[in-house]
Regions:
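Phosphate- and other anionic-substrate recognition elements at nucleic-acid/protein interfaces
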Residues: 2-188
Length: 188
């Protein structure tokens, strides 16, 4: 049986000191009843420094909250390659957003909990990062300057410069931020 250690929100093999070749980054929104959420994702190859695929899952495309959440888990199953770590945006209730969450059923933290449990049950390494950790550091102009994304129209919409892009949303762009941040600062 493998020994695992959970350090805060980081679940990896205790003896793991290798770099991951692939990063499957997720920007989940569990909101099914509260605004129809969108989960953005990307699969990044750290050796080639390129995206393999990215996209979005839309809650409105599913009949129930649980079916949507299962689709996110299925996405992990379909895109998890050998030597992959899952990097997921964590949910943190910021003081300036507190009033907006009154009477919320907190669907996004529930989805994130499902994803963490799935990773734990199947011994998939994962790491949680907050939005504030990556949004300022990886603003669009920085990602564009580094060649990860390109501006595609005058409305300020961006797309990755490599890989397939099945469906795309600003949540996909946030997943890109999480992948790049982990690849550069934490993948060691």
């Amino acid at each position: 049986m493998m020994r695992f250690v959970t350090e805060g929100y980081h679940h990896v093999k205790k003896s793991n000191s290798r770099k991951y070749r692939y990063i499957l980054a997720l920007d989940p929104s569990g909101s099914f009843y509260e605004g129809k959420g969108t989960t953005g994702w990307c699969l990044f190859d750290t050796v080639k420094n390129k995206f393999i695929n990215c996209g979005s899952l839309y809650a409105k495309d599913y009949d129930s909250m649980e079916a949507y959440w299962q689709a996110v888990i299925d996405l992990i199953k379909q895109n998890f390659l050998s030597n992959t770590i899952i990097v997921c945006e964590d949910y943190l209730l910021y003081a300036n957003k507190l009033q907006n969450q009154i009477n919320s059923r907190m669907e996004t933290p529930k989805l994130i909990g499902c994803l963490q449990l799935f990773c734990y049950q199947y011994n998939l390494p994962y790491h949680m990062q907050t939005a504030s950790e990556v949004k300022t550091r990886w603003a669009n102009h920085i990602l564009e300057h580094r060649g990860y994304i390109e501006l595609i129209n005058k409305r300020g919409e961006y797309r990755p410069t490599s890989g397939k892009c099945e469906t795309y949303s600003h949540h996909s762009l946030d997943a890109i931020r999480h992948a790049i941040h982990y690849a550069i600062f934490k993948n060691n």
